Regions:
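Short alpha-helical segments and helix-capping/turn motifs at coil-helix boundaries
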Residues: 56-64, 92-94, 117-121, 175-178
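Short, His- and charge-rich active-site/binding loops that engage polyanionic ligands
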Residues: 83-107
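Domain-level detector of nuclease and nuclease-like folds
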Residues: 98-190
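N-terminal module-boundary/linker segments of secreted carbohydrate-active enzymes
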Residues: 18-88
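Bacterial Sec-dependent N-terminal signal peptides
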Residues: 1-21
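A broad, low-specificity signal marking well-ordered, structured residues that form hydrophobic/aromatic
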Residues: 4, 16, 76, 108, ...
Length: 190
């Protein structure tokens, strides 16, 4: 009985919190089909705000702050984070942003998980924070526009163990970039 009561209270609490903001769906009552779809599209679109490419850096302290591994508030960089030990280097938000680098740890920039060349650097994708992560500039350059996949033999290995090399994927023989196992799922979902 105690488990059931706990479950019921938890369920009721979750349902209460999962409500849309007041008046969010105004104008949808009685609509169906294409008319409803169009109205929902208008509602969703009205809530999206493109902060621009430089605006990504203002979002990263919220979206990519390390609250899990070292829990130190540094930039959570999937290409330099070492989940099982000491990071080779850390970046602080707003410090050491870059365009120029020669070594890992010099600076961090913005990594398009889906390369800009796939969508001709068009808006709004070019500044979509949902798939642009802050990463080490040097490793971002190593990754280049190569797809993410499993590496057969590494030609280059980064300080956290990510690799560049030939693909094991049937039908693709070019170079690929393989992040460490800890972040493969995150990257696959972007």
């Amino acid at each position: 009985m105690k488990k059931f009561t706990t479950f019921l209270l938890g369920f009721m609490f979750a349902v209460t919190l999962a409500q849309a903001p007041a008046n969010y769906y105004d104008g949808t009552a009685g609509l169906t089909g294409a008319t409803l779809k169009t109205k929902l599209s208008q509602i969703i679109t009205a809530g999206a705000i493109d902060k621009g490419y430089d605006g990504l850096y203002t979002g990263y302290p919220t979206t990519d702050r390390d609250h899990y591994y070292e829990n130190d508030g540094s930039v959570l960089d999937m290409y330099s984070e070492n989940p099982t030990g000491t990071d080779p280097y850390n970046f602080q938000h707003g410090v050491k942003k870059c365009g120029n680098y020669s070594n890992e740890g010099d600076c961090y920039n913005r990594e398009h998980i889906v390369p800009q060349s796939f969508f001709n650097s068009a808006s709004p994708m070019v500044s979509d924070i949902h798939f642009i992560r802050p990463t080490d500039g040097k490793v971002n350059g190593i990754r280049n526009n190569y797809p993410h996949s499993v590496v057969a033999t590494a030609t280059q290995t980064t300080l956290n163990g990510s690799e560049l090399g030939e693909s094991t994927t049937t039908g693709y023989t070019g170079p690929v970039f393989e992040p460490i196992d800890e972040f493969k799922g995150d990257i696959a979902r972007m």
